[in-house]
A protein has these predicted regions:
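N-terminal signal peptide c-region/cleavage motif recognized by signal peptidases
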Residues: 13-15
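Cleavable N-terminal signal peptides
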Residues: 7-8, 18
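Positively charged n-region of N-terminal signal peptides that target proteins for export
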Residues: 1-4
């Protein structure tokens, strides 16, 4: 019985991962492109550095979500988070917020037919 439960848990985990999408965001000049990402719980958002010195720093995030503050430059070219809590995540570049370098991630619940991950 334990083997069946373990196999079922592994299957559910792999099915959820199969639905997860990656949402790329380019970090360059004074802009995140795209500035708004629409995601589903379990998806990832991946920032890729192009030029300059920047951060991706969470501002307001849903309760229970993890904050982040990552420096991005020629030595730190990629950063990724998995969104696990539905809601709106606002973030910015600490160096260029005055120039409008901000972004938003809007996360909805599980898509139809997707099995939500459990802890």
């Amino acid at each position: 019985m334990k083997k069946i439960l373990l196999l079922a848990a592994l299957f559910i985990g792999s099915v959820s991962a199969a639905w997860a999408a990656d949402h790329p965001v380019t970090v360059s000049d004074f802009v995140f492109t795209p500035s708004t990402v629409n995601a589903v719980v379990g998806d990832t958002v991946s920032w890729t550095w192009q030029n300059g010195m920047h951060t991706t720093t969470s501002l307001s995030i849903p309760k229970g979500a993890r904050r982040w503050n990552k420096h991005m430059d020629a030595s730190h070219t990629r950063f990724r988070i998995r969104v696990t809590v539905p809601g709106t995540y606002s973030y910015r570049c600490n160096f260029h917020v005055a120039q409008g370098m901000t972004g938003t991630i809007v996360v909805s619940g599980a898509s139809p037919g997707q099995v939500p991950a459990t802890n």
